[in-house]
Amino acid sequence: PKERFFTDRIPNDIAAFRTNMGRSLWSKCLKNNIRIINQKFDKKEILSRDHDKWYNPIYGEKANLTYLLKPYHSFITLRTPHNAQPYLKTTFDEVWQYAGDKLTEMSKNKFRSPEDYTQELFRTWQICRSNFNPYNTYQDTKMFPLVFKSKKAIKAVREQSYKLVCLNDNQHIRNFDNMLKELKAAFNHILPEKSTFEL
């Protein structure tokens, strides 16, 4: 439903910090995002201005690190829900205007590189500009890595346990053909009719 993503035309999102000690390529790219955010935004000012958005009880334990790092002067990586993300078009315009040279240079890479940025740059910018409504995206969405949790994923789809699920595949899924057959059956169970774009 549309209200899951927007309220009064403003994106619903969670503003909460997470640790990023990783050495993976993804972790490095997230750190690149935060460098730009810290160049543009003052953490103390943002968290003071939007106190009720950053310290909202709806986030539950997902906000623990945000409370703990309140005295810390810089932004760190925000939680990155692995699901569909609402954006405002103006956010893309603003970020591109501010960091367009870096983004253009990055877009020349044929493959991900340690100097890249991710879409989380735009999301974090949007949150720092106060263009969001507090919403705990973890309360009604779930990401299932199919390599570990294919049975749980299939059950969640069939029973419609969440408003939104992300099914993350990879090349190491055991019994892939059987898992895919069961997953298709779960979707056919809840969506027996073809959608208009399939007709």
Give, region by region, the residue ranges found by the protein language model:
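ER/Golgi luminal nucleotide-sugar-dependent glycosyltransferases, focusing on the catalytic module
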Residues: K2-L199
